[in-house]
Amino acid sequence: MRTLVTGGAGYIGSHMSLELLDAGHSVVVLDDLSTGRAAAVADAASFVRGDVGDQALLRRLLEDNGVEAILHFAGSIVVPESVANPLAYYLNNTVKSRALIEMAVATGVRYFVFSSTAAVYGMPGSAAVAETAPLKPLSPYGSSKLMTEIMLADAARAHALTYVVLRYFNVAGADPLGRAGQSTSRATHLIKVACEAALGKRSHLDVFGTDYPTPDGTCIRDYIQVTDLARAHSAALAYLSAGGASDTFNCGYGRGFSVLEVVEAVKRAAGHSFDVRLGARRAGDPARIVAASEKLRHNLGWVPAYADLDVIVRQALQWEDRLAAAQP
């Protein structure tokens, strides 16, 4: 299948490109390199540096390459940044997604897989979160993604386009073959930041909040390995190409780990301790958010291969070692 991967020079998009190429699909990557790295783009993919909101460029790419499916990863993802600068998030995540959806419709793209987020649920209760849970985003980031979900659903109802929305929980780890990993500067993902602290790339790791209603007082999250996530996208694409109806799926394992459990896993992988500083809560952090993933497993036949926190952490730490070795 001929595919366009937006944000394909970023963390998840680069893994998706590898997954598609490994399966024999053709891949065009569109990325403005605002946070991505050209070096992260797979050699076998065609790379175009540009803005996902540039409709003239989009039309040319989609028509010239006969694109049948779009996998849309491009966007901004830092929750506190979205609170400080909400209009930038509505531009980058919502307005530009609208431009992409419009060009998909105009050029006859058949399938659209959208990278959304568990942030659309806001602060759910203690139970695993199903796709039918109330949508109450707490940040402009979550709202910007939910708005795109709504636009995509409305466009699909009006046109010959089918889609899958995938709501990610906490993505972590690296390609098992060492071809890709998270290279984002100023990263905020816990596992990456903890690995950086373990390797001395950071002076310490901050833990925000130790008084949550959880067994050890720290937040609990559902961590999904990035290659497993890419394979969920491949399963979504196969589902759509087989005639599946538009739908939405959570992407997580259905099991949560606390911040301190993650810290201990990083210490085990590194073989030593590092400076961990316990601090106050951050506003808007749910105590616990874990995916109900039965729908993804049942409807798309998704079977994760790396659902083990120690495996995920080892991959992330090995990737950080590679990044350190590559520094001049």
PLM feature segments, named:
Residues V193-P328:
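C-terminal substrate-binding subdomain of Rossmann-fold SDR/epimerase-dehydratase oxidoreductases
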Residues M1-A174:
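N-terminal Rossmann-like NAD(P)+-binding domain of SDR-like oxidoreductases, especially those catalyzing
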Residues Y90, L138-L146, A180-K192, D222-Y223:
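Short-chain dehydrogenase/reductase
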Residues G8, G36-A38, G50, P80, ...:
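Glycine-centered small-residue hotspots that permit tight backbone geometry or close packing
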Residues S97-R98, L146-A153, I191-K192, T227-R231, ...:
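Conserved active-site helix of classical SDR/Rossmann-fold NAD(P)-dependent CH-OH oxidoreductases
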Residues A38, F169-L190, G200-R221:
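Short, flexible, glycine-rich and Lys/Arg-enriched loop motifs at helix boundaries
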